[in-house]
């Protein structure tokens, strides 16, 4: 594939967006969100059709395989009191051993190594935390928790008691229902600090309708972390590196994909995290999907040929984000920006609680399709 030099520049993935287009609340029911359907290549204009997510079932076929991400968002945002006075926030990301956890802090400049922090709840003894060091790779802080919160299961109990679901900063409206509404209906494996948002559109009713049509379902796990939501700062994308995220692709997923291929079905990823999980597992297998459990730091951008994924249901992503690069790898950068302009013109809602886009396998660039 011959790339336009601009495809390797981060600044080429910018687009203007009125803040009013950023969804602050989810629609109800889930499947009532709008759906931009990307026309297959070779079709006459327009480049897209407009529908609702409920109508997506009409685009799928019996024998197709949907791959969902079953991660569950932790209540990973902690509000703490600093020993010198004032409040701060911690977003707990990943373990660093011996009760230490990597956290993003706010305000970061006031969280210095050696600082004491206090986690408080009404009627309970405060829990003492301590900032151990700065983490240069992430810009975060390594924080010491009490030793009995050394593993993920123990920490989850603490987060459930003291924490909040960490909504993205562009969502200004917070509601108690967010703790469930910012989860997919099938979220079952705790570990993420952000939701796999394309899956938020799949209601129980839509999942049942797809099942009745003969569409198959399998689930991978990718615990959404720093690699998904951290801003890209590398202008020359040939040197881009992403923070790794924990992935599990089980034997039954591999079997489901093989069975799908055998019946001439299509492998459809629900969300970019499902793409990253499948393609990361295939990369570990030398280009062939195999079961996998471990970190994935795969960068998908224009020029990438997919090994597993044929089509994609996805949300509208932030300018200059790694997710925008991934979707551009499927449909081409200029075409994707034209599709985003179409969505903006028709008043689609953007980002986590926003509307969706359906990329049919026929809309994927031929050079990017699985062999």
Swiss-Prot record:
One of the protein's GO biological processes: queuosine biosynthetic process
Main location: cytoplasm
InterPro entries in the cross-refs: QueA, QueA_dom1, QueA_dom2, QueA_sf
EC numbers on record: 2.4.99.17
Cytoplasm found in the keyword field: yes
Gene3D superfamilies: QueA-like
Keyword check for S-adenosyl-L-methionine: yes
Gene Ontology cellular-component annotations: cytoplasm
Keywords, sorted A to Z: Cytoplasm, Queuosine biosynthesis, S-adenosyl-L-methionine, Transferase
Recorded superkingdom: Bacteria
HAMAP family: QueA
Functional note: Transfers and isomerizes the ribose moiety from AdoMet to the 7-aminomethyl group of 7-deazaguanine (preQ1-tRNA) to give epoxyqueuosine (oQ-tRNA).
Subunit note: Monomer.
Family assignment from sequence similarity: Belongs to the QueA family.
The protein's name: S-adenosylmethionine:tRNA ribosyltransferase-isomerase
Organism encoding this protein: Prochlorococcus marinus (strain MIT 9303)
């Amino acid at each position: 594939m011959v790339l336009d030099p601009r495809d390797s520049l981060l600044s080429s993935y910018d687009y203007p967006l009125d803040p009013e287009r950023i969804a602050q609340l989810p629609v109800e029911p889930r499947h009532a969100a709008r759906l931009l359907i990307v026309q297959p290549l070779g079709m006459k204009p327009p480049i897209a059709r407009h529908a609702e997510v409920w109508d997506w079932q009409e685009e799928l076929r019996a024998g197709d395989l949907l791959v969902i991400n079953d991660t569950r968002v932790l209540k990973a945002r902690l509000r703490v009191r600093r020993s010198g006075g004032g409040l701060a926030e911690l977003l707990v990301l990943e373990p660093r051993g011996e009760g230490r956890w990597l956290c993003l802090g706010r305000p970061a400049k006031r969280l210095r190594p050696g600082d004491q922090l206090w986690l408080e709840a009404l009627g309970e003894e405060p829990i003492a935390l301590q900032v151990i060091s700065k983490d240069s790779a992430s810009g975060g802080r390594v924080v010491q928790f009490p030793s009995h919160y050394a593993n993920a299961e123990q920490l989850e109990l603490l987060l459930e008691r003291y924490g909040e679901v960490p909504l993205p900063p562009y969502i200004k409206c917070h509601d108690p229902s967010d703790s469930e509404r910012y989860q997919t209906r099938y979220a079952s494996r705790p570990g993420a600090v952000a939701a796999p948002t394309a899956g938020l559109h799949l209601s129980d009713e839509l999942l049942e309708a797809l099942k009745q049509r003969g569409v198959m379902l399998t689930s991978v796990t990718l615990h959404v972390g720093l690699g998904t939501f951290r801003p890209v700062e590398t202008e020359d994308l040939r040197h881009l590196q992403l923070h790794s995220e924990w992935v599990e692709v089980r034997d039954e997923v591999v079997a489901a994909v093989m069975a799908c291929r055998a019946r001439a079905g299509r492998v459809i990823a629900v969300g970019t995290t499902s793409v990253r999980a499948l393609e990361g597992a295939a990369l570990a297998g030398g280009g062939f999907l195999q079961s996998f459990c471990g970190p994935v730091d795969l960068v998908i951008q224009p020029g990438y040929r997919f090994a597993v994924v044929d089509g994609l249901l996805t949300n509208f992503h932030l300018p200059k984000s790694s997710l925008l690069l991934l979707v551009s790898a499927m449909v081409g950068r200029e075409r994707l920006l034209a599709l985003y302009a179409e969505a903006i013109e028709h008043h689609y809602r953007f980002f986590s609680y926003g509307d969706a886009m359906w990329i049919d396998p026929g809309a994927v660039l031929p050079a990017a399709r699985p062999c």
